[in-house]
From Swiss-Prot:
Keywords: Host-virus interaction, Inhibition of host innate immune response by virus, Signal, Viral immunoevasion. Pfam families: TIL. Belongs to the polydnaviridae EGF-like motif protein family. SUPFAM superfamilies: Serine protease inhibitors. InterPro entries: Ser_inhib-like_sf (IPR036084), TIL_dom (IPR002919). The gene is O1. Interacts with host PAP1, PAP3 and SPH2. This is Protease inhibitor Egf1.5a. Residues 52-104 form the TIL domain. Counteracts the host humoral immune response by inhibiting the processing and the amidolytic activity of host PAP1 and PAP3. Thereby, melanization of host hemolymph, normally producing several reactive intermediates toxic for viruses, is deregulated and proper immune response cannot occur. Residues 1-28 form the signal peptide. One of its GO terms (biological process) is symbiont-mediated suppression of host innate immune response. It comes from Microplitis demolitor bracovirus (isolate Webb) (MdBV).
Length: 343
């Protein structure tokens, strides 16, 4: 059998060449040392000047992308030190450090808990702000409520309960402020005083009283200034079985609260009953009028203010304008009263 020595020598040469290349590749591959660490490819490291960190090894042949905790789709390639690869059982976290796989999962759970806690805190703060917005302390005055409010106090209507309904302004001139409608009270945030009453009921020019009694100029003008039983009934309404043709200045709704019965008992509930009052049904007076007589309100002082004609249908005629008083230069006696209040 003839063997071509030339071909054989060529084959031996090729075999020796590939064997040498194979040994070089084996020498270049990293070898695993102690647990979790790798021997470094010192030859290539010296050539490139790259030093891998803890839990990393050098891999000069790396061509694929490396996984990390928050990117498992191998889309982010070569974003860290080139050719440094996490050791087996390790993975890069968000801080670019190689950590154990279980530590990576814990890190993700902590992130989720932090985000959830932050969202809950934001929600709780918004709820707390909403509660503060509608808290009782943020309301300066209690607004007037419907009839239900009166029922809250078992039907007792006095200074205390009215203050709860309408609100009590500081330095209030009247302990028992007049009963106003819900809309009127709300216009002034529950403050019922000389200024707000003038805004509600109107203030005539050169008024002798800073607080005009509870009648608007329009109502007085409707009847050419004549204020008597007939005109008052037209303005305020006349309940059936009324004990007084000239009922106090109440609205229809207020009168209906007591089934149209207006007497000593119901008026005391509405207006309050002052001590040593000469009359259980005290008319609505202004602060100025009361001060004229040092706070003494009795038959004599009221006659001086309102006048008392003989056979008068009302002993204390309310609703007198300054104009009537001014006609006589402020002199109110039997003669002037007879001209004002026709006997």
């Amino acid at each position: 059998m003839y063997i071509d020595t030339g071909i054989m020598s060529n084959n031996i040469f090729l075999f020796a060449f590939f064997a040498l290349v194979g040994l070089t590749r084996i020498e270049a591959m990293p070898t695993k040392g102690s647990e979790g660490t790798w021997d470094v490819d010192y030859e290539d490291q010296e050539h490139t000047g790259i030093t891998c960190r803890e839990n990393e090894h050098y891999n000069s042949t790396r061509i694929e992308c490396e996984d990390e905790c928050n990117d498992r789709n191998n889309k982010l390639c070569y974003r860290f030190q080139q050719f440094c690869w996490c050791n087996e059982g390790y993975i890069r976290n968000s801080s670019h450090i190689c950590v154990k796989l279980e530590d990576c999962l814990k890190d993700e759970e902590q992130k989720s808990e932090t985000l959830a806690s932050s969202a809950n805190n934001d929600s709780s703060k918004r709820l707390e702000d909403d509660l503060k917005l509608f808290s009782h302390d943020s309301v300066s005055h209690t607004s007037l409520e419907p009839e239900t409010q009166a029922q809250k106090f078992n039907g007792i209507i006095n200074e205390e309960t009215l203050d709860l309904v309408f609100g009590k302004p500081e330095n209030s001139w009247a302990e028992n402020k007049p009963l106003e409608t819900k809309t009127q009270a709300q216009k002034f945030n529950g403050i019922i005083n000389e200024e707000t009453l003038d805004l509600v009921f109107g203030k005539p020019e050169n008024s002798w009283a800073e607080n005009k009694p509870l009648e608007t100029e329009t109502q007085a003008q409707k009847f050419n200034g004549i204020i008597n039983e007939e005109t008052l009934d037209l303005v305020f309404g006349k309940p059936e079985n009324s004990w007084a043709e000239n009922k106090p200045l109440e609205t229809k709704t207020q009168a209906q609260k007591f089934n149209g019965i207006i007497n000593e008992e119901t008026l005391d509930l509405v207006f309050g009953k002052p001590e040593n009052s000469w009359a259980e049904n005290k008319p609505l007076e202004t602060k100025t009028q009361a001060q004229k007589f040092n706070g003494i309100i009795n038959e004599e002082t009221l006659d001086l203010v309102f006048g008392k004609p003989e056979n008068s249908w009302a002993e204390n005629k309310p609703l007198e304008t300054k104009t009537q008083t001014q006609k006589f230069n402020g002199i109110i006696d039997q003669y002037t009263r007879s001209i004002v209040f026709v006997f």
